[in-house]
Amino acid sequence: MSGGGGGGGSAPSRFADYFVICGLDTETGLEPDELSALCQYIQASKARDGASPFISSTTEGENFEQTPLRRTFKSKVLARYPENVDWNPFDQDAVGMLCMPKGLAFKTQADPREPQFHAFIITREDGSRTFGFALTFYEEVTSKQICSAMQTLYHMHNAEYDVLHAPLADGGDQSGMEDGEGIPGTKLQRFNSYDISRDTLYVSKCICLITPMSFMKACRSVLQQLHQAVTSPQPPPLPLESYIYNVLYEVPLPPPGRSLKFSGVYGPIICQRPSTNELPLFDFPVKEVFELLGVENVFQLFTCALLEFQILLYSQHYQRLMTVAETITALMFPFQWQHVYVPILPASLLHFLDAPVPYLMGLHSNGLDDRSKLELPQEANLCFVDVDNHFIELPEDLPQFPNKLEFVQEVSEILMAFGVPPEGNLHCSESASKLKRIRASELVSDKKNGNIAGSPLHSYELLKENETIARLQALVKRTGVSLEKLEVREDPSSNKDFKVQCDEEELRIYQLNIQIREVFANRFTQMFADYEVFVIQPSQDKESWLSNREQMQNFDKASFLSDQPEPYLPFLSRFLETQMFASFIDNKIMCHDDDDKDPVLRVFDSRVDKIRLLNVRTPTLRTSMYQKCTTVDEAEKAIELRLAKIDHTAVHPHLLDMKIGQGKYEPGFFPKLQSDVLCTGPASNKWTKRNAPAQWRRKDRQKQHTEHLRLDNDQREKYIQEARNMGSTIRQPKLSNLSPSVIAQTNWKFVEGLLKECRNKTKRMLVEKMGREAVELGHGEVNITGVEENTLIASLCDLLERIWSHGLQVKQGKSALWSHLLHYQENRQRKLTSGSLSTSGILLDSERRKSDASAVMSPLRVSLIQDMRHIQNIGEIKTDVGKARAWVRLSMEKKLLSRHLKQLLSDHELTKKLYKRYAFLRCDDEKEQFLYHLLSFNAVDYFCFTNVFTTILIPYHILIVPSKKLGGSMFTANPWICISGELGETQILQIPRNVLEMTFECQNLGKLTTVQIGHDNSGLYAKWLVEYVMVRNEITGHTYKFPCGRWLGKGMDDGSLERVLVGELLTSLPEVDERPCRTPPLQQSPSVIRRLVTISPNNKPKLNTGQIQESIGEAVNGIVKHFHKPEKERGSLTLLLCGECGLVSALEQAFQHGFKSPRLFKNVFIWDFLEKAQTYYETLEQNDVVPEENWHTRARNFCRFVTAVNNTPRNIGKDGKFQMLVCLGARDHLLHHWIALLADCPITAHMYEDVALIKDHTLVNSLIRVLQTLQEFNITLDTSLVKGIDI
């Protein structure tokens, strides 16, 4: 062991590692706070030479508008004991900053000087933590040089003040104000003045314990009793060194499941540690958080933390910041915060608020500035919590936690049982606590926190000693009323057969803590009771898995979400993408058995196993029914047992082998401790030997020590794993002395982290997208829709906001990206001449004469500014953050995101104006890589704009392409068109005669599915051969092609006057320049030449029975797969039924096979055969020739449906009628009955050859079995397919 070793024992065996003293170093004098270095780097200000050896020469950090007493000065670590321990190297910079986050503070005898306690955490870059507990108090300054230096600063301040405010001297009400308080400067000067001849100067000093575990209450009591010993008029029983030595070297760390009692200066101190099968150690009062914020705000903050938003806590009290942060992270069990975690942000590290990564930080408030004056670098994804004022600002689109209402109700009931109002109590923390301090001031050792030293008295015992209460009791007793039943219960567990060894208030804190934590833990246990089923175990060895971790999918998110109740999805889909969930699953994969498991995971898995045993239903069947927590009593009992039977009492403090005469007691001054006795632990610990028989109950020390080492190794392995796998963001900033190189290195890490996160996100989205495309068959619906895609896109939007917020010169609006876009738009409009950006020609020139028509649409303008205008014209989007996200979604859907951002960043002058040199957007290489990663999104199709903004008005452009052959140009009828999509359909749109291209506007139709086109059969030549129809969304640019290749006209083809066309999306060419593709290839090219359904030996397709069977099987398989997807991810069923390879086409081929050739030029259609079969069966029914009841029912249904289709008012032609009949049969699960019926019909023998498929009973039976698989699905038809029929 180095540095004097810190005594015998290894890392886990000691309660405390260090005792630290921080304060004013009289040798170096007054130095301004570390902010000066930050100013030097960012503002490049020049240093000025000082005027006194006791005033630092670097004074650019000073604010001469503030009086010297209000300024902060640099604090130093004055002493630490021991010097160092191997298992926890002392971090002097971090300890110094966090003990006194704002440096030294000076006060006079006129100022309040109550001691302040706060806890803090030092989180290393690997994620491991050390805990600190600091008590800050004020000592009189005895150094004449320091007093003189303070006097000099006041002279300088007054001179500077007079110069700055002299012109305002006659201004009356405009006299100098200071600090925005509205108090005249002269009055404030007098109030905060310092005169060396009449004032006593005090400076802050801090004593601190550094511990391996967070025993907050015990450490606070130790420090308070030490402080009380210093301020008491009587010296303590023993020198302070004895008590400090005792807590450092002779008080052991309690093992899991054990309790410990040791001695402070004036009284015993008790702490207890949960066992390995309980919730982890947590020693902060949950009650205070709910009182400060209220239940609703706590739940909102909790949700933000789970979704890894940036969280900034804001308070005047360091301990409140720490309590809120620790409570929120403790309630996350079994998940752990994986990002930057600085509950108390030192003033010298304010630049970390610029970090473009998720963080949870606490910012100290001076109590003067309100929220509006607080300039934060980024707010798009920020949750801001003003702890003191019961106020929270939330990010947009925050999903609700599952079962939130029932969850809040359960928590509120617990709070009310403990007398805590669920809505919070704005006044509880100040006025009520002050009253308590006044009432019990003589018994309180720390006036700020209300902790009672020594053997605390219960509040009821205090009341019994009150004379007024005693008189009231006597009066009541004289009236004959018994007070026995009204006695205040002295101990909450008095009905049990044991008594706890702590005061009632402390026990109630323990009880409330564990009850609230159990309820929160129960929620996650219920929500993730079957998570193990969806963990994807790696097939390769551990090393290979670790090296390829970022490319691996370790949790089947889609299947998990498909099992969840619908209300859970918005929250769960985003939570499954967080780093904390990924780390949780990684831990699960890494730990193959209980011996290897992370302790937290072991506890959670044991609770999951217990739920599975208790629940009757199988684990994979989830329910949205709320189930209350049932583990509270068991958890409470474990704590009460530990507090009732103390497992170990540590050695009492004793006299040390000290030099006589040193450490003389002076009331009000913390003495200079003897380092020779405190820096080295006991060599042969006689005190430990003397107490050797007092072993830990139930377990010997060696076994406990082995358990500690194992847990420590598990923890270390976990951190190593996370450091290797989760390096996409900075885990923790290093708290160190600032210098330009350190700040530059930190920002460079931020830039690298952002680039890596961008690479991982794009890869994750592409793998998810293309993985789904690879398993799709038969149709072009290859897109993730619904919750999962929205989650991934929202995550990308958050990343873009963080990138655009990094290194901003001045924040303008909540969305840094939209602010940049607006600046760019303003610059472009200023540079270009008026009207040159107009794109109205596309909409206004909406009609083209038929003679000008060509087979392609006019090109759509591609412009960053035009896409911005589209977003600005959407009235539903109110905020800048919403507009930025909508613009990103639109750009992604148009496959222009990378190009638009490249164009935006091409204005280098604007970028330099908006961003500091270290900003990500000014790092050229990283910026290019970032744009390259975004370019990969062009390989897949997104509908992230169309599927989200479902109610907006969208202009659509239509192009009808008729055949130029066979007199199509002589068409005289009046055509009409109706367009249908996944979100709705248009009314019938009348097309002006001889117009083939037009634009109309309607509510978003979603992805287009069908076009109905027809005419009124008027005029001399009412015959129209339409090749195809094209429809384009003028905002997203998506173009759909609807092939036709058929006549519309009486006496032509099948005599149809209207047709239902099924279309597919055309793909666009990769971006080469701004010209759109004029002849885009099809995603799945439906043939322009329509399948020929007129039965003619010269033109019918030559498919054999095997090919027909295969096409029917693929069509049915496509429908089955459609229904096996989560509902949100299903594509177009219309395409599967009526598309080029759909069910209608496949059955058409089956009925065409072996059809006898017609005589002469007469065309015979399948519908002709069906009508004859209908006539045959109706005749049988009329003649009462019924072979069997089932046959009769099938025949009656068949005839009813054919009649209904024939009676439809629509002029859809014979092929259209066949399509309608097949769709209705599929909907009502009748197709397989009709196939059997038609195969047995005598009409079939007359109209089909002997080799026909429908006459082969084996093939027919096979076809029936295939069609029967559709029976289990509820098929809903597009209204365009069954319009005009009521059956």
Curated annotation (Swiss-Prot):
Tissue: Expressed in developing brain and developing neurons.
Domain called uDENN: residue spans: 57-259
Residue positions, PTM Phosphoserine: S193, S1085, S1087, S1096
Domain called RUN: residue spans: 787-950, 1134-1280
Sites of Phosphothreonine modification: T1079
SUPFAM superfamilies noted in UniProt: Lipase/lipooxygenase domain (PLAT/LH2 domain) (SSF49723), RUN domain-like (SSF140741)
Primary location recorded for the protein, binned into one broad class: Golgi
Stretches assigned to the cDENN domain: 278-414
Domain of life: Eukaryota
GO terms, molecular function: guanyl-nucleotide exchange factor activity; small GTPase binding
Chain ranges of the dDENN domain: 416-598
Domain PLAT, first and last residues per copy: 954-1062
GO cellular component labels: cytosol; Golgi apparatus; Golgi membrane; retromer complex; trans-Golgi network
InterPro entries in the record: cDENN_dom, dDENN_dom, DEN5A/B, DENN_C, PLAT/LH2_dom, PLAT/LH2_dom_sf, PLAT_RAB6IP1, RUN1_DENND5A
Keywords: Golgi apparatus, Guanine-nucleotide releasing factor, Membrane, Phosphoprotein, Repeat
A biological process from GO: retrograde transport, endosome to Golgi
Pfam families: dDENN, DENN, PLAT, RUN, uDENN
Localization (cell): Golgi apparatus membrane
Family as reported in the entry's similarity comment: Belongs to the RAB6IP1 family.
Function: Guanine nucleotide exchange factor (GEF) which may activate RAB6A and RAB39A and/or RAB39B. Promotes the exchange of GDP to GTP, converting inactive GDP-bound Rab proteins into their active GTP-bound form. Involved in the negative regulation of neurite outgrowth.
Subunit structure of this chain's protein: Interacts with RAB6A bound to GTP.
Protein name as catalogued: DENN domain-containing protein 5A
Organism: Rattus norvegicus
GN (gene name): Dennd5a
